[in-house]
Amino acid sequence: SLHAPSALVLTVGHGESAATAVPLRAVTLTCAPTASGTHPATVSACAELRGAGGDFDALAADAGVMCTREYAPVVVTVDGVWQGRRLSYERTFANECVKNAGSSSVFTF
């Protein structure tokens, strides 16, 4: 195929690290050749990831969202392949609101 594969599994769980957090939800996100998967916003999430060059730390936070300072940590993991390269990512957010505001759509699941 002309497109290198981009297929990811994203999970979210309560806790400070993926080693101890039990996954509450898991979604799939495939971005090539077309956007698909169980992620609730495949097209926008793929567009956002392409814009960030597949760098999850480069995703822009949604500036319009105000979150409480409550500390109820959630951890997001991403594993799979992005444009043919293996990828494994983990990030902890202070709470669910902060997670959802951490990107436009990638972490909103």
UniProtKB/Swiss-Prot annotation:
GO terms assigned for molecular function: serine-type endopeptidase inhibitor activity
Q: What is its main location?
A: secreted
| Localization, UniProt | Secreted
Q: Which GO terms describe its cellular component?
A: extracellular region
What would be one Pfam family of this protein?
SSI
Annotated positions for site Reactive bond: 69-70
Q: Which domain of life is it from?
A: Bacteria
Which Gene3D superfamilies does the entry mention? Subtilisin inhibitor-like
Per UniProt, the keywords (alphabetical) are: Disulfide bond, Protease inhibitor, Secreted, Serine protease inhibitor
The cysteines covalently paired via disulfide bonds are: 31-46, 67-97
Report the sequence similarity comment from the record: Belongs to the protease inhibitor I16 (SSI) family.
Instruction: Give the protein's function.
Output: Strong inhibitory activity toward subtilisin BPN' and, to a lesser extent, toward trypsin.
How is the subunit organization of this protein annotated in UniProt?
Homodimer.
Q: What is this protein called?
A: Subtilisin inhibitor-like protein 7
Source organism per entry reads: Streptomyces ambofaciens
